[in-house]
């Protein structure tokens, strides 16, 4: 925020595969560039940029979450949710820009968050794609009774929504834990508090979709996702749960990557 206005309409109007790419690959690349600029090009001014990034973080997550709260279209809801996720990632960049020996914690948070977000968001959009192919709609009404029409899709979508919320035993929790932890470690308590409040708001609209899938009357015919989508969904689900249940391996990878990035920046 406030440069997100194009995103919801673009995601909503684009074919779901294109929206998936825009919400994951482009965002990951953008944050890689931003981190590179702040760690190398703006090193002498990093302290001055901290209030700006912190303010953008709060504004971005708040505007994204409260806009998502009003949506009845799941695809559009995830578009605004993607805006809010960018705000959480900015929290990690705030900790990185303090650039002390513990700055690695903020960079770890950014990398972990992006890694978890990649599988979680791709998986969520794949479920939307499968539902849209059968029903022709991405409105929340198309997801009503999904547990009866396609139990596997419903369960995997719950995993992705819980990960986006930041519930333990998911990759999203690992990313949020490191990002929020970095903010607290650098004594940005107010920033972490804003993040927690926003996470609570996000939980409401994510769980609203879960309620529609599990606790509303079944409508429409059974859903059968194409085999390609099924395989991709299984990969995303396993990766999301693996990062939450057995995080040690990915943490080692991220520690190594963070150390190398900071060594180059210094």
Task: Write out the residue ranges for each language-model feature.
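Alpha-helical transmembrane segments of multi-pass membrane proteins predominantly involved
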Residues: 1-266
């Amino acid at each position: 925020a406030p440069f997100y206005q194009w995103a919801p309409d673009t995601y909503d109007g684009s074919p779901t595969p294109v929206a998936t790419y825009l919400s994951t690959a482009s965002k990951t690349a953008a944050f890689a560039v931003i981190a590179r600029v702040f760690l190398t090009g703006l090193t002498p001014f990093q302290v001055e940029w901290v209030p700006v990034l912190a303010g953008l973080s709060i504004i971005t997550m708040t505007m994204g979450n409260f806009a998502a709260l009003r949506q009845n279209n799941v695809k559009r809801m995830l578009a605004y949710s993607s805006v809010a996720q960018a705000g959480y990632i900015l929290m990690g960049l705030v900790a990185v820009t303090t650039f002390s020996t513990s700055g690695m914690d903020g960079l770890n948070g950014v990398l972990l968050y992006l890694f978890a977000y990649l599988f979680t968001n791709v998986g969520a959009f794949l479920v939307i794609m499968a539902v849209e192919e059968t029903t022709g709609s991405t409105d929340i009404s198309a997801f009503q009774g999904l547990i009866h029409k396609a139990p596997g899709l419903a369960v995997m979508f719950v995993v992705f929504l819980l990960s986006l919320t930041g519930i333990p035993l998911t990759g999203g929790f690992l990313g949020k834990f490191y990002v929020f932890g970095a903010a607290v470690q650098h004594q940005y308590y107010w920033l972490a508090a804003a993040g927690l409040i926003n996470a609570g708001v996000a939980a409401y609209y994510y769980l609203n979709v879960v309620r529609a899938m599990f606790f509303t009357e079944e409508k429409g015919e059974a859903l059968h996702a194409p085999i390609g989508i099924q395989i991709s969904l299984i990969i995303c689900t396993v990766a999301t749960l693996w990062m939450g249940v057995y995080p040690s391996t990915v943490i080692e990878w991220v520690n190594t990557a963070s150390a190398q990035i900071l060594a180059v920046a210094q």
